Regions:
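Structural preference for beta-rich elements and adjacent junctions enriched in aromatics
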Residues: 1-250, 256-259, 269
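Conserved catalytic alpha/beta cores of large enzymes that bind or transform nucleotide phosphates
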Residues: 262-263
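Short acidic loop-to-helix transition motifs that present clustered carboxylates
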Residues: 266
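Short, intrinsically disordered, charge-balanced linker/junction segments flanking boundaries
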Residues: 271-275
């Protein structure tokens, strides 16, 4: 991050509770160390920066513990500094699922099973894996009427792709090399190559692709490292695409150096993409 970016899709595992006693409003929040990736630090103590905001929507005002705004060029650096014990732990979350769909009209029954694994190896390393994911529980996108010549950008709300995705961002939020919403998007077709089945191919085109698996590894340190891979399932009259991304990033004094490489294998069209 450049110190002033916000992520509205961040949905970490934290707990909070509020109460009113003697006319005073209290709020307590439990934030586990595993909530975010942090660079490895030597020694028994770790220094971190924090700030707290409270928004009063009724009057359109916000109150903060710091003298700074996300709209200013300098933001994270003005956070208050705290020192804690240098704790490092590991956490493993496993979310299996199974679904059964019964189509009475076509007398068709479809069953699916899969799982998502989130392994926080330590404070700086994390490995995420999803097998045959089901993203049916993800909230729908807002309706946007767009008459411009440019495509509307929708952020990815799927948990696997949303978590630690900022590792693969470059420059600012308006300059995106990777759009994970493409993964699992509309399949590629070449119906003209199927002869007598061309019309049937046109009629059975799918709007989305199933994902066989996806893997993401991120590591924070002197050199930040990230790798992501995803493979789509072959559909009727279509072959799934394969996606790869590699990210390296480091800082030296006031300069930041980075590399982002992406590759997409498109077996149907043969137009493989490499950036």
């Amino acid at each position: 991050t450049d110190g002033k970016e916000r992520n509205w899709d961040w949905d970490a595992d934290w707990q909070s509770a509020a109460s009113i006693q003697d006319g005073v409003w209290y709020s307590e929040t439990f934030i586990p160390w595993s909530i975010a990736s942090m660079k490895t630090q030597a020694g028994e103590k770790r220094k971190i920066r924090m700030a707290f905001y409270r928004m009063l929507m009724g009057i359109g005002r916000g109150f903060s513990t710091i003298k700074g705004s996300v709209y200013e060029n300098v933001y994270l650096s003005v956070f208050d500094e705290f020192e804690f014990n240098n704790y490092s732990g590991s956490k493993l979350d496993f979310f299996p699922y199974t679904t059964l769909t019964d189509d009475f009209t076509n007398s068709d029954q479809i069953s699916k099973a899969g799982a998502e694994v989130f392994w926080k190896i330590d404070s700086s390393k994390q490995l995420n894996l999803t097998l045959n994911p089901d993203f049916g529980q993800v909230e729908s996108d807002e309706v946007v009427v767009n008459f411009s010549a440019f495509e509307t950008f929708y952020s990815d709300k799927r948990p696997f792709f949303a978590e630690n995705n900022s590792m693969f961002d470059v420059s600012d939020r308006m300059h995106r090399i990777i759009n994970t919403r493409r993964i699992g998007g509309r399949p590629d077709y070449d119906c003209g190559s199927y002869g007598d089945l061309q019309d049937y191919c046109q009629q059975t085109k799918a709007e989305t692709s199933e994902i066989d698996f996806a893997l993401k590894y991120t590591q924070k340190g002197e050199v930040d490292f990230g790798f992501m891979s995803a493979s789509e399932r072959d559909e009727k009259f279509s072959e799934g695409r394969d996606f790869y991304a590699l990210r390296l990033n480091t800082k030296s004094n006031d300069l930041k150096y980075g590399y982002l490489g992406t590759y997409v294998n498109k077996p149907v069209t043969g137009n493989n993409s490499q950036v």
